[in-house]
Amino acid sequence: MPHRKKKPFIEKKKAVSFHLVHRSQRDPLAADETAPQRVLLPTQKIKDEERRAEQRKYGVFFDDDYDYLQHLKEPSGPSELIPTSPFGAPYRGDGREEPLATSTSGIKLPSSVFASEFEEDVGLLNKAAPVSGPRLDFDPDIVAALDDDFDFDNPDNLLEDDFILQANKPTEEEEGMEIQKSEAEDDSEWEDVDDEKEGGSDDDRYDRAGSSDEDMSAPGKPLGAIENHFFWEEETKSRFTEYSLTSSVMRRNEQLTLHDERFEKFYEQYDDDEIGALDNAELEGSIQVDSNRLEEVLNDYYKEKAENCVKLNTLEPFEDQDLPVNELDGSEEEETVTVVLEEAKEKWDCESICSTYSNVYNHPQLIKYQPKPKQIRLSSKTGIPLNVLPKKGLTAKQVERMQMINNSDLPKTSTQPRLKRESKEDKRARKRAIKEERKERRVEKKANKLAFKLEKRRQEKELLNLKKNVEGLKL
């Protein structure tokens, strides 16, 4: 068979490459949760070497994939708009279309994977940005100081060095009012003394007060205007603050003045003559037992109760009422009545924090920890419980035998010192004797181990039989 060229899966000449980018903030679908937040952006096939060579002409020598030429274009150059499709062929001047190498005729993708055709003027993040620009609700002086437009050279905006002394210094009007007030007080005191001594009529006192007031009254003002109506006695308090509005540190502009007038009008409805019926107030809270207020209330209650209580000092019969004859006769007889007096139980007049934890019927105590009993383990060889039977020491015969072995005076070959000038025959004989001694020791050790094992097993069986009250029988 002739060799056929295999058709490639992707034709590079007709393929179109895309970049997966985030959707623009000005895209209307950026706030849509159902729309994908990443879109496909077609790549522009421009050779990197040509672009870098073009960048070197303008002094850009960065060796990366970023296009720096887009920042070097003339912003005021001539431009011409040519309508074209996003993936269409470029338009040539002779009226023919030059097909691109990357044809999109075979691409069928949904419109949701591409950016929207129409975009908004303001992005989504800029809509949530704080307000910028001039703020009309700010004080003009504050805005001028923030913008460095404050006129520091204006003499009205400057403070004197002794502005504190000038502010505390009383004015001429205040000094005159203080002098008039002091003179009026002195005159009134002397007039009271004269009235007490002479005991004159009200008309005389009125004439003297009038003559004294006329002397210190200001020209052009009546007498009562100065004596009974001073500036500091003017009613300048509001209904809802009890303070003078003019004494506030804030400058009262039109809006604040309107705000104060509305509150004044609102509280005017609740004056004493128009207050009407009010709901009962629900008072909640607590008071200390040893408070002075509570003691005063209790004392007032006891005093009122003592005044209303009527006590009889002597018991006397009514004069107009006659006692019956039966009662007079029965009064002579004495009757014995047995009265059982019970001791009054002592009542608690106080309570401590300990008494809240218990009472006379409940006596709490600590719960003692009882350890869990140990499990009985059985021997895998004999089936006898371990660590239950008492352990016995060596018998008298075994102790005697052990002492005999330990106290033996027979020298052992292994413990004899080796001579420095030992011959070969002596060395062989010594080694042979050591081997025989070790052999005998192993045999003896094995026999002792077996004897001890049998004796231990016999004793455990005897103790077990004694515990179960079973006598051992020999067959």
Swiss-Prot record:
Biased region (Polar residues) positions are 406-417
Gene Ontology terms: biological process: ribosomal small subunit biogenesis; ribosomal small subunit export from nucleus; ribosome biogenesis
**Carries keyword Phosphoprotein?**
yes
Q: What UniProt keywords are attached to this protein's entry?
A: Coiled coil, Phosphoprotein, Ribosome biogenesis
Coiled-coil region: 419-475
Name the residue ranges with Acidic residues bias: 184-197
Q: Which InterPro entries match?
A: Ltv1
Q: Where is this region: Disordered?
A: 23-53, 73-104, 161-223, 406-447
Please give the residue positions where the record annotates the modification Phosphoserine. Answer: 17, 24, 248, 331, 408
One Pfam entry name? LTV
Q: Which GO terms describe its cellular component?
A: cytosol; nucleus; preribosome, small subunit precursor
Listed Basic and acidic residues bias regions: 198-211, 419-447
Function statement: Essential for ribosome biogenesis.
Into which family does the record put it?
Answer: Belongs to the LTV1 family.
Protein name per Swiss-Prot or TrEMBL? Protein LTV1 homolog
Q: Which gene encodes it?
A: LTV1
